[in-house]
Amino acid sequence: MEIKDIKAVYFVGAGGIGMSAIARYFLSKKLVVAGYDKTPSNLTHELEKEGMLIHYEENVDLIPEACKDAKTTLVVYTPAIPAEHKELVFFHENGFTIEKRAQVLGTLTRTHKGLCVAGTHGKTSTSTMCAHIMHQSHIDCNAFLGGISKNYGTNYILSDKSDYVVIEADEFDRSFHWLRPWMSVITATDPDHLDIYGTKEAYLESFRHYTELIQPGGALIIHKGLEMKQHVQAGVKIYEYSQDEGDFHAENIKIENGGITFDFISPIENVTGVELGQPVPINITNGVAAMAMAQLNGCTADELRNGMKTYGGVDRRFDFKIKNNKLVFLSDYAHHPKEIYQSAKSIRELYKDRKITAIFQPHLYTRTRDFYKDFANSLSLLDEVILCDIYPAREQPIPGVTSKLIYDNLKPGVEKSMIHKEDVLDLVKNRDFDVLVILGAGDLDNYVPQITKILEEK
């Protein structure tokens, strides 16, 4: 189905962060946009205010009539939805065009210049940073992001003049194989989603295949030292980047007085005096990648500086809620051992002499089973670790796989305890903290507004 032929779009799994960005795209085109989600959330409520029709019961009768014409309705679904879902079965049985979110994005990369960011971690911050730099420049861009940009209050950026689209390329379920990037950053290839891939080798092969999809004339910007083989088409340039070395890197890094500045070293043009609007050490590396992609597509030195200085961050990515001399409280989406390591390392660099406590909710039974020792090692960088029950998301429990696997492997000297998420608010009321961070991609984040309020009132 061509995008020009679509009159209505129905989403099965409307409230996911990636799905909602596409929903907003079709809302901007003045189409009928509706969908199902399992539970209401802040995001679904926002979509409803913007004009989307959403229901929360798995019921074919609740699908709007405007979305029941197979000739003019596109159905978009998330892989997290089971194949036996009643509404999905209805659409299959009645000949509807049914596409994954990634297929829709793939179509857009064929009609626009796709600037894609892939990788096990760092892709949301890097893609959002790149989108902000591009959007405030003379070039502009559209963007489909994996988090809510604090600069724009949304995960979707619309431009009616730019041919560029910035996309977070998701490796889950091999979704990024639908894309045809003009350029792509690859931030990291630490194995993940082994419930899908089975082996580390299959995971790395998936990224290798992804590099084949970059269009001739474009470029691959890959983090230096990754354990993968790229296989680009003729005419695709390859650049390496990292914090300290590569074609693109940072020099003269200064972390002082709560701020971070550095010089951006580039084969095109060096940019001195770059200031991070969100001064977190990991954003030096993310910033180098984002600036590289933006510079390769025509952003000037002043636009790069201004974009980095005014970048406000992403919800749940090093998201500071309270920041003063007495107390620091932040929320971070880190849910892979390497992400947690980088978050913990950044927090430790910022607050060298303060006690750092993490409340961590592991995400997925399979990920916990596969990486519990790595989780324990990363969390052991902190002074105190409070573990919640595993957030299952799409999975069923696995016998013997609980948060205690991580608990038992934390290094000696780390204060540790286990807690049910329902008891977190009482814990916060009855404890004093120096630096407190909520870690994980589950639903513990729903408590963050209440935790913030409790801490502010103390």
Regions found by a protein language model. Give the residues of each.
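C-terminal helical cap/extension that packs against the catalytic core
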Residues: 50, 237, 376-434
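Short acidic/histidine-rich motifs immediately flanking catalytic phosphotransfer sites
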Residues: 68-74, 162-163, 432-434
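Beta-strand->loop->alpha-helix junctions that form or flank phosphate-binding loops
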Residues: 36-37, 55-60, 99-106, 144-146, ...
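N-terminal leader/targeting and accessory segments in enzymes
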Residues: 1-100, 104, 219, 249, ...
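Phosphate-binding loop of NTP-binding sites
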Residues: 25-31, 48, 62-67, 79-222, ...
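Short internal beta-strands
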Residues: 31-38, 220-224, 357-360, 382-392
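Nucleotide phosphate-binding/pyrophosphate-handling subdomain across enzymes
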Residues: 2-8, 18, 25-29, 256-258, ...
